[in-house]
Regions:
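Sec-dependent signal peptide recognition
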Residues: 4-11
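C-terminal motif of bacterial Sec signal peptides marking the signal peptidase cleavage site
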Residues: 16-19
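Active-site-proximal mixed secondary-structure blocks
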Residues: 24-67, 72-157
């Protein structure tokens, strides 16, 4: 039984290998095609592109939106939202321990760019997006293709 299994695996591997062959493989002999251009950017964190997101929170009784590009997965049920502690939206997040993370599609880019360019301390951004209140009480953008309603567990400064 063990030999049949090994033979079947070998045959399957050969079939897959032959199915994945490409006629372009012979063209790769040309060394110019094998060279990729690289640029030395120095010692930087370069895990890009990151998804563009708009974070929503209630601040002083009004919805506020903040553009955030540093969002990542830190566990099977946890994400990390990284932003400067100087942002106006932080006070609402710290008070309520709630926020929404709204992915941005191409149609949303102009408004996302705008909310990322002005401070909620000086500008009312609550009407920039049509939204509804999520199950956890955070503002959720209606047009966003994917939304995460988040309850804050920890804040690191």
């Amino acid at each position: 039984m063990k030999i049949r299994f090994i033979n079947a695996v070998c045959i399957l591997a050969l079939i897959l290998a032959s199915a994945c062959k490409s006629d372009n493989a012979s063209q790769l002999k040309d060394k110019e095609m094998m060279i990729t251009e690289k640029k030395n950017i120095g010692s930087k964190l370069a895990l890009y592109p990151m998804p563009v997101t708009v974070v929503g929170a209630e601040v002083n009784g009004k919805v506020n939106w903040l553009l955030v590009a540093h969002v990542g997965i830190i566990g099977h049920d946890r994400i990390l939202v990284s932003m400067s502690d100087k942002h106006y939206t932080n006070q609402g997040i710290i008070e309520s321990k709630k926020l929404s993370v709204n992915l941005v599609d191409r149609k949303m880019l102009p408004k996302a760019d705008y909310v990322g360019s002005v401070s909620g301390a000086n500008t009312d951004k609550s009407h920039e997006f049509l939204f509804h209140w999520g199950e956890n009480g955070s503002p959720v953008i209606d047009a966003s293709p994917l939304v995460m309603e988040c309850n804050v567990v920890d804040i690191y400064k």
